[in-house]
């Protein structure tokens, strides 16, 4: 009788432990899940004929930032919060670096409807912008100029403002994809998410510049980046 009681207690304890661990495991999966979402955003906005990011701009970019599912606070209020990834060109233009995590806060995008979820993509077009981006904190429009990016097959219709900008940015919300200047938003590295992905609290600059091996979850995103870059070179 006592043995049967002990077995029941063991089973109950095991179930309780697995339930208590579920939120932790789910939280650990979030950065990997977000990488998949970032890859989906990149695939969709780069594949849209005449309505996406020009391939020649991606080819010239030093870094890219993708934030899937950026949340907007309320109608008429510009506050936003979201998490995403950045990747930069490897030295010698040999593909793209392992992704580093970012959080974006604040800023304003005028046409957004409050409470909506928005996908953001940014291309960093200058060395100055890419260097600042890898700091622990980076404010758009303050530490690097930002402009709404052009939409289309090529960037031949770029304005002077776009050509001079350190960063070009785009937004997709409720099916609408357009260039948008995300002034005042702050990008911060997320050491906790880096720890989850890499097993160490690595700084973004270290991940990008020291040849850190990308996690398996980043394979699709990096394959897309390399593929779209190669397409521009061969078209």
Task: Give, region by region, the residue ranges found by the protein language model.
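Bacterial N-terminal signal peptides that target proteins for export
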Residues: 2-12
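Bacterial N-terminal signal peptides
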Residues: 12-21
